[in-house]
């Protein structure tokens, strides 16, 4: 049996080698809090005395939370994600970071959640950088007045309530009156600009869905994909199944993605659908955090909630790159009541509103825009010269028609001027009808509105107005493409363009027939039939009474 020998020299050398190579870990200091209470997407955390407002906190299971209430002894935290695994007594750590989202061109064509994570099953998104959600809006000196048009492709909007790049235009109306359809049409109408490849014309679009049904968000994505508009659109989705915290943050996520492009000198269109649901989510969060309620139980800072969001939409000065972000917030009313708290707040923040009436929608006047109440406070300076030339007094005429419409049933007793105003108003209303997802190019819209405002449709039966417009535009594309291209390239409606259009109109009248088979060309009217004897007697009696 061998003896165990101890060699002190080897032991000493090994110890000396270990001591010389030893590197102690750097001392670390970490603030750790404890969950005192959790439920309904809210957690109250004790400890963490150095936590900042809007700081991200990490729970034990990796779920993130947002510190909103900084009380004396506790922090009120909104849980961002699934809160089922968060229990009383768990530890909470500070991250030292403010909530931010990844941004970049790779987000176009994708659907993401309010944290910027993809939810469309198409893989991860490679971001260019990150951007804070709570970011200061451009200052007064960094802005420029709105002067460039942003065409929606909707005749009733581009002619009477035009929108400029950098403008905030509210879309307001009852549920199921076509608010989302107007927003989607506006996105689809940017396709021609996108395909031009000109950065000065291209508009990147962001659609923020707040509290919508999942099926509705899927149908919007499908409509954009079918129209070829998804390639330049980002969808930020916070469906109805999401927590109130996610619905509250979703608009800021969309705004952060858009601001990245705006400060890069590009043009952005962002749609918030809809801010009523965001305000309701913020109300729920505030009540759960025990903040004092105000009017309609909303917290006192609900105006600031929307103002700091919508003020980020701007037209930047040339020194800042001349980028722009145009905002189309949507607000849902109850029984057409625009005097409620949230509608009046957003109306006062925005640069105009498009008011949709449920009775117009029910009478098949779509888009159901009430031109008497709708207004654009800054878009007029961004209107193209061609549109200005053909619209003229269109808005006033239609507002007067709406006021006189109640007397339409007494048309036989009205004077000739009033009857003519009613007839033209009916034809203009018919002309402004437009199916969903079919925006008009600016040149075709100019020609269409010229037909209505110049009286060229006065002899066309009301039921034939849209068919006349469609066939006349087809006729111009086939035989007079030069007229349309002149308007498209110059965005002007010159005298020679109008005279050429007049000649084309007269040529078209030779081939157009009404639904009853008649012609509307002067000199081709059917002869009036002779009155029957009893009708002659009746006419004479009426004249004697009037005489």
From Swiss-Prot:
GO CC term, one of those recorded: plasma membrane
Catalytic activity: ATP + H2O + 4 H(+)(in) = ADP + phosphate + 5 H(+)(out)
UniProt entry keywords in alphabetical sequence: ATP synthesis, ATP-binding, Cell membrane, CF(1), Hydrogen ion transport, Ion transport, Membrane, Nucleotide-binding, Translocase, Transport
Region of interest (Disordered), residue spans: 526-547
Signal peptide interval: none
Ranges in coiled-coil conformation: none
Subcellular location: Cell membrane
Membrane in keyword set: yes
Role according to the record: Produces ATP from ADP in the presence of a proton gradient across the membrane. The alpha chain is a regulatory subunit.
Protein family according to the UniProt entry: Belongs to the ATPase alpha/beta chains family.
Summary of subunit composition and partner proteins: F-type ATPases have 2 components, CF(1) - the catalytic core - and CF(0) - the membrane proton channel. CF(1) has five subunits: alpha(3), beta(3), gamma(1), delta(1), epsilon(1). CF(0) has three main subunits: a(1), b(2) and c(9-12). The alpha and beta chains form an alternating ring which encloses part of the gamma chain. CF(1) is attached to CF(0) by a central stalk formed by the gamma and epsilon chains, while a peripheral stalk is formed by the delta and b chains.
The protein's name: ATP synthase subunit alpha
